[in-house]
């Protein structure tokens, strides 16, 4: 029924609908990308969204605040906290009400503190194929910005859009604009996935000579890998490249100057979309 309580009738929900949730495995997929580009990096993965991809504002702020606290403690005493040199944020939102601006201000202050401590912040630009600034990706002093943010000498905030596999063109879904600093592979990316087996079956099956043959089952990920697209996957590629560029860092952490140098080197090495002009 429409008002069935999932706690009382769990068999009406979940895997029996034959499909996995839209963003199931999002974090696992990102971790796999980081591992591919920076195999020696240590990953601290923190969940902020449910299986439907909705991020609660208070949860995001609380999580980022905890990350900054861990970073600050480690900078004060390397035996405590956690050494966070690059922070990847594969999420985005837009300002819909004046209150959203206040939320972004608080988020900016937290990220500014992390950057002050030498932590590079990498953000996905969004997948809406528009040039409207998304947040937190646009929380920097981009050309023509009216956000009141001034240039500083802290570790950079890097906003990343998605390239097609050819690395010659921007993916059609990727957000664009002067607030997007770099583009990286983000379409048809291969990475790790939870070994999930859904209820949907292959469309066609035709066994021959004792061999089972069938078309791809879109909900069968028992192999542990998947193909996915989005700026959520461009950002961790850049974040991992920056981490690899930093290499082994001092116990006390990375200086903002060293972080900026590493970012500049990585951005310079990324593919550049072909300019029609």
Residue ranges and their predicted role:
Residues 2, 138-247:
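Extracellular S/T/G-rich loop segment that most often corresponds to the catalytic His/Ser-adjacent loop
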Residues 1-44, 59-62, 66-83, 90, ...:
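Active-site core segment of subtilase-fold serine proteases
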Residues 77-91, 156-157, 247-277:
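C-terminal subdomain of the subtilisin-like protease fold in secreted/lumenal serine endopeptidases
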Residues 30, 87, 241, 245:
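Terminal peptide-recognition signature
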């Amino acid at each position: 029924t429409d008002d069935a309580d999932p706690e009382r009738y769990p068999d009406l929900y979940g895997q029996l609908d034959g499909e996995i949730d839209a963003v199931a495995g999002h974090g696992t997929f990102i971790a796999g990308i980081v591992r591919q580009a920076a195999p020696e990096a240590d990953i601290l993965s923190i969940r902020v969204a449910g299986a439907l991809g909705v991020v609660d504002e208070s949860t995001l702020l609380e999580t980022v605040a905890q990350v900054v606290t861990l970073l600050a403690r480690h900078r004060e005493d390397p035996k405590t906290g956690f050494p966070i040199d690059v922070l990847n944020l594969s999420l985005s939102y837009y300002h819909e009400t004046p209150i959203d601006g206040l939320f972004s201000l608080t988020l900016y202050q937290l990220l500014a503190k992390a950057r002050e401590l030498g932590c590079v912040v990498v953000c996905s630009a969004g997948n809406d194929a528009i040039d409207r600034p998304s947040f937190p990706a646009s929380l920097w002093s981009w050309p023509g910005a009216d956000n009141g943010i001034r240039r500083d000498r802290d570790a950079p905030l890097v906003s990343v859009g998605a390239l097609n596999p050819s690395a010659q063109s921007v993916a059609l879904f990727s957000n664009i604009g002067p607030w997007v600093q770099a583009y990286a592979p983000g379409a048809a990316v291969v990475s790790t996935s939870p070994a999930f087996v859904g209820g949907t079956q292959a469309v066609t099956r035709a066994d021959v000579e004792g061999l089972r043959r069938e078309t791809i089952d879109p909900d069968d990920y028992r192999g542990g890998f998947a193909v996915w697209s989005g700026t959520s996957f461009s950002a961790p590629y850049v974040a991992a490249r920056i981490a690899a560029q930093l290499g082994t860092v001092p116990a006390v952490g990375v200086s903002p100057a060293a972080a900026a140098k590493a970012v500049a080197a990585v951005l310079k090495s990324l593919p550049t979309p072909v300019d029609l002009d």
